[in-house]
Amino acid sequence: DQDCLPGWSFYEGHCYKVFDVKKTWEDAEKFCTEQMSGGHLVSFHSSEEVDFMIKLASPILKFDLVWIGLSNFWRDCHWGWSDGVKLDYKAWSDKPNCYVAKTVDPQWLHRDCSRTYKFVCKSRVPR
């Protein structure tokens, strides 16, 4: 839809895909960058975008947790999205290293970056 690759879903100028495979945060982020130019773990910039991800992920993953691009993985104590977009919308519960989002409600939880979770990739629509 809207020029996304087959299997990807369009929302507000970006393409999204849920991956039903577990990886560490770093491996999931690397995987997303390899899927599509400009790809990263999903970042959120509105509650509507979170709702879109929940609608996309919950039928595939049921109740689960997915890695999102929020971390301080590369920036000591500086929080930011892995796609470089500034942190303008927050829904977190606490504050350590990497974050997962629930697939059933708009809540983010911190988890050790070395744990493995399923994930959602996001990319700009390819030109």
From Swiss-Prot:
Cellular component GO terms held in the UniProt record: extracellular region
Compartments in which it is found: Secreted
Keyword Acetylation: no
Coiled-coil zones: none
Keywords in alphabetical order: Disulfide bond, Hemostasis impairing toxin, Secreted, Toxin
Pfam family, one: Lectin_C
Signal peptide location: none
Tissue specificity field: Expressed by the venom gland.
Limits of the C-type lectin domain: 11-122
Gene3D superfamilies linked: Mannose-Binding Protein A, subunit A (3.10.100.10)
Principal location: secreted
Gene Ontology molecular function: any one: toxin activity
Function of the molecule: Interferes with one step of hemostasis (modulation of platelet aggregation, or coagulation cascade, for example).
PANTHER family per record: MANNOSE, PHOSPHOLIPASE, LECTIN RECEPTOR RELATED
Similarity annotation: Belongs to the snaclec family.
Subunit text: Heterodimer of subunits alpha and beta; disulfide-linked.
The protein's name: Snaclec macrovipecetin subunit beta
Organism field: Macrovipera lebetinus (Levantine viper)
Source taxonomy: Eukaryota, Metazoa, Chordata, Craniata, Vertebrata
